[in-house]
Amino acid sequence: MKKNSVISQEEKKGSAAFQVFGFTNKIRRLSAHLELHKKDYSSQRGLRKILGKRQRLLAYFSKKNRVRYKELINQLNIREIKR
């Protein structure tokens, strides 16, 4: 997935949308790695940490800009956070 298709020019590298996009890419890569290496516990821990970071960032983003949050989760094909 290309960053330019999800992130607009106004949103810089530090924006919440950009960070969520980066975490989502890392999560997908680690998930694919863990399908091959089921006993890689260090990577499992790293995946859980990244999932937590993304969840906190999505919670912040949903409070800040609900419309853009909905667009982002639809573009990235991820579920909404639980409330």
Swiss-Prot record:
GO terms for cellular component: chloroplast; ribonucleoprotein complex; ribosome. It is found in: Plastid, Chloroplast. CDD domains: Ribosomal_S15p_S13e (cd00353). InterPro entries: Ribosomal_uS15, Ribosomal_uS15_bac-type, uS15_NS1_RNA-bd_sf. Its main location: plastid. It comes from the Eukaryota. One of its GO terms (biological process) is translation. GO terms for molecular function: structural constituent of ribosome. Gene3D superfamilies: S15/NS1, RNA-binding. Keywords: Chloroplast, Plastid, Ribonucleoprotein, Ribosomal protein. Pfam families: Ribosomal_S15. SUPFAM superfamilies: S15/NS1 RNA-binding domain. Part of the 30S ribosomal subunit. Belongs to the universal ribosomal protein uS15 family. This is Small ribosomal subunit protein uS15c. It comes from Fagopyrum esculentum subsp. ancestrale. The gene is rps15.
